[in-house]
């Protein structure tokens, strides 16, 4: 099992330094790509996660006015191991803890640098976030592209929401996936060996 996980995602096409340079020099064009600003921020957060030894996934929660009301990144290994600290979970935990009187999330949008895994997708469906946009698909670990495989009740609950890929250029899609690939195989092996 550990051998399979060591090559599941493969190496990123760029080094960590090249990815940092790409993030820092990236210029947005929101006229052509309306999700690019928040998509880029989710990638910057994902890179922070990698620098701390976590999976490279970052998330931004935005209200109906386009204001950022939450942001965070994967914290699975650092500051200490917590199996529930996926990027989406971190953002939703903090938001829900600090906004207990909000009864509807229908007008909110969550941006994530990588397509949500099964656990995060179930959480986002339960939360009722109106729209969840991912920068990069994850055909190996993502669940959005497999929503028809969810149990029927989850499909019914998810029908009130949208889960599209973010409107961003392919350059940002590749950047998001390369950030994730920086340490994904290594960290998956750590999980297998727990």
Describe each model-derived feature in a short phrase.
Residues 70-71, 87-104:
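Glycine/small-residue-rich phosphate/adenosyl-binding loop
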Residues 49-53:
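Short loop/turn motifs at secondary-structure junctions and domain boundaries
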Residues 63, 85-89, 168:
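A structural motif shared across PLP-dependent enzymes of the aminotransferase-like
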Residues 104-114:
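Immediate flanking context of iron-sulfur cluster ligation sites
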Residues 57-63:
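Short beta-strand scaffold segments in enzyme catalytic cores
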Residues 67-76:
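Short beta->alpha transition motifs characteristic of CBS
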Residues 1-48, 116, 122-194:
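Zinc-dependent deaminase
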Residues 75-90:
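A short, polar/charged loop-to-alpha-helix boundary motif
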């Amino acid at each position: 099992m550990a051998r399979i996980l060591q090559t599941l995602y493969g190496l990123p096409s760029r080094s960590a330094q090249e990815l940092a340079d790409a993030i820092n020099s990236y210029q947005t064009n929101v006229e052509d790509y309306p999700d690019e600003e928040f998509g880029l921020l989710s990638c910057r957060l994902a890179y922070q996660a990698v620098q701390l030894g976590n999976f490279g996934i970052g998330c931004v929660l935005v209200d109906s006015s386009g204001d950022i009301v939450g942001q965070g990144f994967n914290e699975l290994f650092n500051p200490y191991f917590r199996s529930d600290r996926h990027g989406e979970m971190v953002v939703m935990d903090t938001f829900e803890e600090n906004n207990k009187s909000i009864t509807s999330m229908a007008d909110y949008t969550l941006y994530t640098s990588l397509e949500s895994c099964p656990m995060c997708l179930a959480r986002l469906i339960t939360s009722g976030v109106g729209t969840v946009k991912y920068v990069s698909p994850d055909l190996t670990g993502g669940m959005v592209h497999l929503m028809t495989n969810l149990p029927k009740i989850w499909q019914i609950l998810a029908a009130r929401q949208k889960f599209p890929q973010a409107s961003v250029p392919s350059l940002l899609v590749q950047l998001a996936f390369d950030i994730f690939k920086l340490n994904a195989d290594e960290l998956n092996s750590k999980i297998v060996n727990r």
